[in-house]
From Swiss-Prot:
This is Serine palmitoyltransferase small subunit B. Changing H56L: Mutant mice develop early onset ataxia, exhibit reduced body weight and usually die around 10 weeks after birth. Increases SPT affininity toward C18-CoA substrate by twofold and elevates C20 long chain base production in the brain and eye. It comes from Mus musculus (Mouse). One of its GO terms (biological process) is sphingolipid biosynthetic process. InterPro entries: Ser_palmitoyltrfase_ssu-like. Component of the serine palmitoyltransferase multisubunit enzyme (SPT) that catalyzes the initial and rate-limiting step in sphingolipid biosynthesis by condensing L-serine and activated acyl-CoA (most commonly palmitoyl-CoA) to form long-chain bases. The SPT complex is composed of SPTLC1, SPTLC2 or SPTLC3 and SPTSSA or SPTSSB. Within this complex, the heterodimer consisting of SPTLC1 and SPTLC2/SPTLC3 forms the catalytic core. Within the SPT complex, SPTSSB stimulates the catalytic activity and plays a role in substrate specificity. Expression is strong in hypogonadal (hpg) mouse prostate, weak in mature castrated mouse prostate and absent in normal intact or androgen-replaced hpg mouse prostates. The gene is Sptssb. Residues 30-36 are lumenal. PANTHER family: SERINE PALMITOYLTRANSFERASE SMALL SUBUNIT B (PTHR28612:SF1). Induction: While expression is androgen independent in the hpg mouse prostate, it appears to be androgen-dependent in the kidney and brain of normal intact mouse suggesting tissue specific regulation by androgens.
């Protein structure tokens, strides 16, 4: 894979981010505030998914295994 193309792709993604969030027309302190808020939201979503998705998968597995007639469940 060509590293120049990868660099150009990330530059394009960053440009798209600036256009979508209107960061291109903001002052630097406004950009940093918006970036902090977005980073906080993304971090919270990733953490919540990391914590709660395995629990829901286990509960769904137990629910459907009881419906299908399997008596064994995942041991804790």
């Amino acid at each position: 894979m060509d590293f120049k193309r990868v660099k150009e792709y990330f530059a394009w993604l960053y440009y798209q981010y600036q256009i979508i969030t209107c960061c291109a027309v903001m002052e630097p302190w406004e950009q940093s505030m918006l970036n902090t808020i977005i980073l906080t939201i993304v971090a919270m979503v990733v953490y919540t998914a990391y914590v709660f998705i395995p629990i829901h998968i286990r509960l769904a597995w137990e629910f459907f295994s009881k419906i299908c007639g399997y008596d064994s469940s995942i041991s804790n």
